[in-house]
């Protein structure tokens, strides 16, 4: 965060103390009266814009750059979601919006946000391009049956490009067979497993391969399926679980989050408990769709909710406790002598968490499997909300 105190000497009329921090504030004091704390970001940003004259400053820079025939400036802002909502709101109002709204578009912004942790005040969203980079939204236009295929292809291309770069080898297949034990399992199955573990997120792919390297390659052994599974659990324990279990700053909660860390931990524990119960139910079920499973191999990592309950899971989703894999219709509720389908979102529980809790993570070929009624978590979510209020 930024902590900075700036005081103006008292004049006959007023003195102002400005404090910039993770939760900016203005303290104003006149000779006649003390004013109360002003937390409205728009008022504060108006003061900053007048003080720093960002538009005039940018105009001078633009004229200088145009003299050397520079026509556009692209400003890339990464990890803006690390700011709290008030600070981000103020930054956008003060810096981004005035430059973005410039009539000739000389300054162009590319801004990275986490879902549910973004705000763009004073900017018309209908006039900007927005790209969702989670694999479901990125590839869903290819068709529901192609989403996973496209995401796995991305993982494969990403890793193979890294192999080409770091090993300077044209024969990538030889390097792959050296890094991975391809005797019991094909290289494509390894890429599929890495996709399940990391959900096509480059940072998570890098982390799980880092843990895998320490367990295998650094000891002169190739990466195996078991190594990747153990690494997924280690990554979960080290990088994801502490978000709900440690007392450190809870950085990536949704801006609309109304529940405490302890309450979200309770929700996650309830999800885990139900997944374990579902594993037993599937393994002992007489239903035809579950006939190939026992209590030791029944996949129970799915859950789905109605779209109106999405907000309650947003913080868990952006922190990778769960991952969205589909938006579709459920089997429906029986009303007025007919079944009426609901719009639902289907998630999977984090692969490393499944390893830790002995929840079977698998991908049955039957797409109807994941919307079986036992994966309906709406009642669980609604009861948790009522008990947490």
What residue ranges belong to the model's regions?
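Conserved P-loop NTPase mechanochemical-coupling segment
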Residues: 1-53, 85
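Low-complexity, serine/threonine/proline-enriched polar segments
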Residues: 3-19, 23-26, 151-162, 256-276
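The catalytic "switch" region of P-loop NTPases
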Residues: 42-187, 232
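Generic recognition of flexible, low-complexity loop/linker segments
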Residues: 61-64, 96-99, 192-195, 301, ...
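Short, hydrophobic, well-ordered secondary-structure elements
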Residues: 74, 110-113, 195-213
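Generic recognition of stable, solvent-exposed alpha-helical segments in well-folded globular domains
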Residues: 90, 150, 154, 189, ...
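A long, hydrophobic alpha-helical segment
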Residues: 178-196, 208-211
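C-terminal leucine-rich, beta-strand-based interaction scaffolds used for sensing/assembly
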Residues: 197-200, 204, 214, 221-389
């Amino acid at each position: 965060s930024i902590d900075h105190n700036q005081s103006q000497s008292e004049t006959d009329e007023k003195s102002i103390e400005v404090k910039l921090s993770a939760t900016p504030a203005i303290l104003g004091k006149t000779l006649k009266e003390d004013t109360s704390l002003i937390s409205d970001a728009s008022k504060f940003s108006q003061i900053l814009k007048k003080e720093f004259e960002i538009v005039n400053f940018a105009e001078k820079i633009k004229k200088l750059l145009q003299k050397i025939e520079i026509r556009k400036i692209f400003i890339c802002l990464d990890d803006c979601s690390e700011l709290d909502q008030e600070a981000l709101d103020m930054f956008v109002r003060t810096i981004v919006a005035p430059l973005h709204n410039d009539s000739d578009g000389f300054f162009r912004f590319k801004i990275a946000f986490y879902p549910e942790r973004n705000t763009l005040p004073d900017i018309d969203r209908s006039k900007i391009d927005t790209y969702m980079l989670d694999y479901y939204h990125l590839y869903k236009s290819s068709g529901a049956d192609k989403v996973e295929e496209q995401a796995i292809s991305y993982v494969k291309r990403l890793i193979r490009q890294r192999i080409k770069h770091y090993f300077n080898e044209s024969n990538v297949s030889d390097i792959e067979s050296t890094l991975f034990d391809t005797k019991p399992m094909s290289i494509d199955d390894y890429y599929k497993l890495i996709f399940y573990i990391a959900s096509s997120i480059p940072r998570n792919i890098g982390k799980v391969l880092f843990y895998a390297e320490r367990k295998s390659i650094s000891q002169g052994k190739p990466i195996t399926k078991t190594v990747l599974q153990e690494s997924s659990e280690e990554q979960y324990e080290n990088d994801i679980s502490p978000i709900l279990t440690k007392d450190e700053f809870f950085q990536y909660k949704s801006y609309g989050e109304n529940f405490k860390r302890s309450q979200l931990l309770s929700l996650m524990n309830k999800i885990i408990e139900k997944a374990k119960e579902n594993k037993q139910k599937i393994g002992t079920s007489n239903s035809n769709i579950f006939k190939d499973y026992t209590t030791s191999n029944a996949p129970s990592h799915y859950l789905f909710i109605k779209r109106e309950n999405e907000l309650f899971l947003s913080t868990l989703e952006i922190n990778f406790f769960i991952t969205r894999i589909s938006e579709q219709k459920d089997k429906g509720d029986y009303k007025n002598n007919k079944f009426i389908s609901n719009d639902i979102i289907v998630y999977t529980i984090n692969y490393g968490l499944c390893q830790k809790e002995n929840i079977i993570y698998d991908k049955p070929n039957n797409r109807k499997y994941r919307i079986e009624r036992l994966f309906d978590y709406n009642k669980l979510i609604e009861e948790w909300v009522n008990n947490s209020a």
